[in-house]
């Protein structure tokens, strides 16, 4: 299958799971969006760009919005630092318990 076919199937499956019948981006509609870094897209366009992205051949995800909220900016999760800090605290606690 092509990237376009896989993307379309995932898109339709998501619509079905959410009970959404609207097509495309519209005011008030639920939206999860991905912005790719054009510099890593190797001048691909259309189907070729989608194939490159779906099959993971070097296209960098630059920004992501979930439910309209930006969760990835410049390739990094917006709460990455907080999550890493919380992880370190929990890891230290677990290691202390093992000693």
Task: For the regions a language model picked out, list residue spans one by one.
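Active-site microenvironment of metallo-dependent hydrolases
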Residues: 3-99
């Amino acid at each position: 299958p092509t990237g376009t076919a896989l993307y379309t199937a995932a898109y339709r499956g998501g619509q079905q799971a959410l009970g959404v019948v609207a097509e495309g981006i519209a005011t008030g509609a639920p939206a999860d969006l991905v912005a790719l870094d054009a510099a890593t897209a190797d001048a691909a366009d259309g189907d070729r760009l989608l194939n490159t992205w779906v099959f993971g051949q070097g296209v960098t995800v630059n920004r992501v919005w979930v439910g309209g909220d930006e969760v990835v900016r410049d390739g990094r999760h917006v709460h990455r630092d907080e999550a890493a800090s919380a992880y370190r605290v929990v890891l230290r606690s677990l290691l202390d318990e093992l000693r």
